[in-house]
Amino acid sequence: MDNLLISLLRKFEPETAHDISIKLLKFAPILFNKFRHELLEQEIVGLKFQNPVGMAAGYDKNAEVFESLFKIGFGFVECGTVTPLPQYGNPKPRVFRYIEESALINSLGFNNKGINSFLNGVQKRTDFDSPLGINIGPNKDTKNFIDDYTILINKAHDFADYITVNISSPNTENLRKLQDKTALEELISNLVASLKDKKVQKPIFIKI
């Protein structure tokens, strides 16, 4: 069945195939059974993972199917990257399939529906057995990267088990300049300061 599904999805343009898979995943609890074993369990930064295999950010960008991903067996799911405002991303085509190399290359550009729509999905969460991460990034036309990250981390904090600050995208002009030591220290210090009144401090990761 897996091979048949993959063959069918490959008949579509890659981004269309992704959108179809998101729709199909809403029926995942009917199609799959979750496997658990104590030998696979992990604990990292105080978070308990049922297994070390997770779904990275970039798949469930708008927090639509993370619970289905939990139900089919992922040990954690990281949703996003989400930006403060809705963003179309780069012009299409922007996802390229290389079957011979079993590779998929994307130049999406943080396409997503924005943090308010994103949180509507996250607030429906009922499965708290596996960690849910939220990956945050700035809008392409922002005037201030740090302001965008500060808005996002404060809105997302209470709904995430951990937060990933994405400063890796080559599709957002000058974003990677935040990887400079001085700029990164300023970013981190601002984010930490903005969360100082939170009763529970969530783990924060930096994606470089």
What are these regions (language model features)?
Residues M1-I208:
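Flavin-dependent oxidoreductase catalytic cores
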